């Protein structure tokens, strides 16, 4: 088997979005799974729209999710001389030509074609032009598309695709300012980089016949193509920012783990049996682009949150502390190692993202200044206050390093007072955490410690 070489080639006119990252992941997995090469190419020939910040953000996103590319990053803006050489080669071989048609002429032609209910297209009028070029017109360069030929390629996702070359006009390969066009530079670079397999969104499917025309004109080997359907939202519509089409780095800020995001995106359009959770090593062992789905996949926040919660639960306390550094939360320095481990172990089971985990840390460690009203109103004040007073005194006798002792202290009061467990635990939870839900009470007492627990109960009694 020949060496597999893939690439990801974003345009730095905006930030890397979720669909682009999925494409990069598919290309990365295919190359790495076959001990091949994976390259990153920045398609920045549109100098008026390029953004250095966007290019850097793409690179930053790659680093975050762990997609390591081979070799140096290739910037198309540094390769204009190479493109000019190949344009000249096509001109010299009479496979391309200068077109002097003005914009006004082209617009008029399109209007005439529309009036005749024809598809607007260039009419090849300068294809065999040998006369004197009109003055004042900077020509474009057009490729001579072979006529009456059938282009056939077997797409790895879409199956066999056939296009009659008569449906393709002599498209522009260099604009009047000399800047080469997208389809031209993509073809040149994929050929010179030795790309064997192109995995990309199916919005590029219509470009493929044009690129094949160029491959053949330049006697380049045509790569294999895999055109992946787009990602839709859960209503079956194109992704919007509200539904997930945001900058990849936003997901880091929202508290998603890179392992969860990669797993999630790899499963959007690809599957292996009924398996949902894949480590990177498993993806490398199992991924095959031939298994890519031909139908669009749906972005599900529920699925992403479920996956992220899974990966969050499998992080150690020390790993979580590192991951939590970018987020703002209460100081943990007063906690001993056992309390810290207990805090993170308890909260990671109840959190779906790092951001949510950071908020829950605050909910435990910041003493409540107000109490959940609907829970507070249900309390029998005459019963609750003596119970909490008695429990507070009991806490002074308890070893707070022993969670079972803390649990026994609660059960002792419940048994002595002959009350239901909720009669003590509900007001105690409100006193400690300010609300009716949250981590277990013995966990809360252990994490807060004796001094803080007693202080919170006293503050509640004052209210």
Q: Language-model segments: which ranges?
A:
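Non-transmembrane alpha-helical segments in soluble domains
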Residues: 59, 84-91, 262-265, 284, ...
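Residue-level signal for inorganic ion chemistry
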Residues: 27, 58, 90, 94, ...
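Basic, alpha-helical terminal appendages of large translation-related enzymes
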Residues: 1-11, 37, 68-74, 78-81, ...
